[in-house]
Amino acid sequence: MEQELIVMEIICNACEARSLCYEALRLARTRSFEQAEEKLCQAKECLNRAHLIQTQLIEADQGEGKVPMTLVMVHAQDHLMTTILAQEMATEMVALHKHLAGEEAKCLEMH
């Protein structure tokens, strides 16, 4: 596969994962926790695909500059790394929404 297509696969998978993470956050705000968790799982699958492609590029390069570094490659790396961070934060925020929903339910039961 041409390098441009490989790099676009990283970008597409990372962007899809990011969209799924934000969808999970929107669902968590409405207390749709099961659906939010499913979106996070789907995001993880997309990230795994992107990371596998990244790993293959690193292996092909062997630290010797065999894979040409282009601006679009840097762009793909940026998408991947920021999406990994977004996925980690979304996972924590969904957990926080679940925790807060449980605390609110306890308060309502007490009154």
Feature names for model-found ranges:
Residues 1-111:
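Terminal alpha-helical segments
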